[in-house]
Amino acid sequence: MRNHRISLQDIATLAGVTKMTVSRYIRSPKKVAKETGERIAKIMEEINYIPNRAPGMLLNAQSYTLGILIPSFQNQLFADILAGIESVTSVHNYQTLIANYNYNRDSEEESVINLLSYNIDGIILSEKYHTIRTVKFLRSATIPVVELMDVQGERLDMEVGFDNRQAAFDMVCTMLDKRCLLYTSDAA
């Protein structure tokens, strides 16, 4: 048997106010009398109430959620990228939904469709090459799209990364300019 989810009406009854007053307090605490707000806050704390963000998401068409697709949980680079993203999103009260597609374009496509179904406010992709269907879904979603890593090729919206070919070219030119024709590494 499923437990009863605590509702705004439950809080209103316990606080001796209307459901609308509780709703107003959750949205904008300063719009409610200080004493009333303190009473509502105390009750919410006592009963461990967690507001349901779904109605606000529907009303405002904003979820405060970003989708992130990474190709591997095994690569430390992506763990560092996720940590960097989280350090910014958490400060701005955004949540992240993370999907791993294991370098498989069809899996990436399914993950993009799934993330878009959560009404995400933006999406971060780890690569530049996607299925035609993925590109169509992303373009029709009209949300910000950021592609990470390699910046070669046509971008969907925004990109953050580097050009591997140009970096290799610059490296070889520098080596030749310095007359350094051999580079070795102590591979551990």
Segments the model singles out, each with a brief description of its role:
Residues 1-6, 61-173, 177:
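Alpha-helical recognition/docking segments in bacterial nutrient-uptake
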Residues 1-62:
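N-terminal helix-turn-helix DNA-binding module of bacterial transcription factors
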Residues 11, 183-188:
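Conserved small/polar residues in nucleotide/adenosyl-binding loops
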Residues 32, 51, 71, 76, ...:
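Proline-centered helix-kink/hinge sites
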Residues 67-69, 182-185:
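Short hydrophobic beta-strand segments
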